[in-house]
Amino acid sequence: MTPRKLAHELLIKAEKSAQYSNITLDNALSKQNFSPADKKLVSIIFYGVTERKLFLDHQISSLSSRTIEDIDINTLTALRMGLYQLIYLDRVPPHAAINESVNLVSKKSAGFVNAILRAFQRKGSPFLPSKDNIEQYISICYSVCQPLASLFLRIFGEAETERFLTAINTANDITLRTNTLLCSRAQLLENIDTSKPTENSSSGVYAKGSVRDLYGFDEGYFFVQDEASQIAVEALGLKENDTVVDLCSCPGSKSFGAAIEMKNKGKIYSFDLHENKLSLVIKGADRLKINIIETAAADARINISKFDGIADKVICDVPCSGFGVLSKKPELRYKDPSASASLPKIQSDILDNACHYVKKSGILLYSTCTVLPTENEDNISAFLKRHPEFSLLPWKVGNIEAKSGMITLLPHVHSTDGFFIAKLIKN
């Protein structure tokens, strides 16, 4: 099995599966005895082709008389891989990109793949669509489905949509949250090559490479958490001996961050709808030497009366469309937003339940990893009308200031995931 052969197989599998791309890739790499360099090549090609699929297909359509639908998936995937390497991977020689792609297909298809890739090589630059149809232009150039391109254009306008999607398409470092129970951020920065501190969260570190191979992973010195999520936890203003309810906790990063802010003193109840996912929280807490988290399977929309009025802080990081994290979940680029139409009601129901757990003068934190107002500001406005005992509370973390109590973080503005945070107090 070669790295390109594995990438080819995984891309075909991803086309036919609803599984998240990171799970597909991680499961496959764990079964291969590849060198770090080979693992990196598989990851780059797999994610790169997934992220740029519509743009790559536009190149194929511009060079071939056959439609995309008429090309079998094995051949189409090999073409996408070859074009991705020719366009984006400067360190891969063109002859290697072409020959290795030809080797992935049958003899019957080899001539076709070779002809398309060599024709592109002769042209020397990608085909760009016309801007006359701006929705189609955005869809192809930034590789998002046309309904999603249309939605972003309505929310942001043309110029900001391009800035937003350019930032989404820019490769990001991994973001770590230092476990200050066990080590300092300075210690991580000193021992992890090419690392640098995050701009606003006080314990964040940008790093490169495989997470499990980084200094301090086995010792529990850090966990993976985007800076936006770290900012949300810091905005809570946690103290030692607080009682916290985390309603949609898996995979556990906000519960972990809260426990660290509380210096591992107090109590955190981490709930999730899916019991099998809670093992991630349990294992993560064990690695991080955190012992104040109690997990249980529960539907966040259904009240558990014994928790009414007990929490100093309640975290509602609700299920959402995920359109702020397209860089981490590239398969969402091709999801029609209409498929998420039921989410605002689910989010609203979770908020209506969560508010019962907040004690007087306690804090309710609502967050999503989307940029859609229907799941963010609109939900909060409607909640405040239903629950006048709550009000928005201004907050500031680093240079991020939410004077109104809520803010949408954007990758092209704040260098984070697209992320919404609202902080409310029970009066």
Cite the ranges covered by each PLM segment.
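S-adenosylmethionine
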Residues: 1-427
